[in-house]
């Protein structure tokens, strides 16, 4: 499709492509240009597209079934009010989950798609064509959001089904989908803006995630610190989650009871305008930012004059016994702006610390944890996601730069390669690990946590750090495409956290009748186990990985129930066993054989 204007069907197959004068003045059929046209034509040809679409609908129905069993169990429900109450509850859960998924994967797909073009040096080829800035930027943006938009439309019948139960109006459903679509465009525009600006994949992913967290955190901070002001009203308008909350509870602010009063027009328009601003800047600066002027910096040299002659001497550095970890630690393998990302994480940590930890600690978030615990949890999850992104890009960058295959010709062993990558990841992200540990120490000094509980919490968090790093390396080695590796790795982390959060909500809802409704949670956990096993055993069908993928959701469920029952040691042990065993199950195959570590096992050769 991209080379279509250069093709002359009248020419012989033995001739080169001929460029006609009219092809230089071509007019694309779509305003996004041939990049989006190609994606729209090729995406439906992939079997994976239909599997993802049907799998997403299946997940929604599993979640709906679990919520129904949690609410009613095996009772014979005949009351209209009970059905309407369940319809409203199910709408709130599904809408919140969909908005969260849409925002995350819009950001992930857009950032990963453009970053892969840069890593493979194919973006420069696009810049050398007669494609305009608008066609490149909008084409990559809309092509990245095509899968997300398909999933949003595919889920519409599920939400319409909830209307038949009562408790939700069709207007609420439409506005909820409008907010989801606008949020997807906003997060995708932000990720595209960052991806065209930054050079390294890790910088792109980390800046995109930190920017989104800072955006949402700033809006919530304005609402919390200046309630009732114009700034708070604008912050509520620009926040996707607050817009969705107003759609879910239209009577919360004393609005009229008619369905026509439900509207999120201001929020949708505001997010679309902000998206247009980000996209417009990217279109205007595309060929200024790319290619980067820093790509062709010469190595450090010094000139010496002897007998009137000038010689240039290149400064060589001493390399360690393990060159992999030396490169990860002693060079700028991930760009020159990594320190800025660490400072941004520190700023986010400071804002969360000020807003939630130093705030009113008596308020319970969803009746589960205090504001201080919720702040720590959010900061820890952000750190784990960034560590995982660092790990998976450490492998995908090598593959895209065609340097991973060169390792086969060297004497570097699999252990040196894998341990070197893991050591570099943990060293480069040491601040992301230390800051939550320091906050745990602050909890102990304030008397919020006992010394015993703080030790359990620190051990559990360090275990999750190792799991996040190893999962990134495992996904990077197991997938041949960088986009698939990044999506699989970060998607697994994201689904684990979202699944845990939803499971905790359902457990609180079914606290009074948990014993009789365990089968509903069993279905939810089994679905998660199947997805995790498929993700972990994509390239290496190891029995240990199958066992780890099957046990991890069940042990996580046990840790959640133990936590809600005020358990401490049991929670720590279940987390260490579940995630520690999974980490070891991913590590051992990677360091056992060099072919396996490079993702080229004998299974691929038949």
Task: Tell where the protein language model's regions lie, with residue ranges.
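Transmembrane alpha-helical segments and their membrane-interface loop/helix boundaries
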Residues: 1-105, 112, 147, 151, ...
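Helix-loop-helix units of permease transmembrane domains in multi-pass membrane transporters
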Residues: 36-37, 113-145, 324-329, 395-428
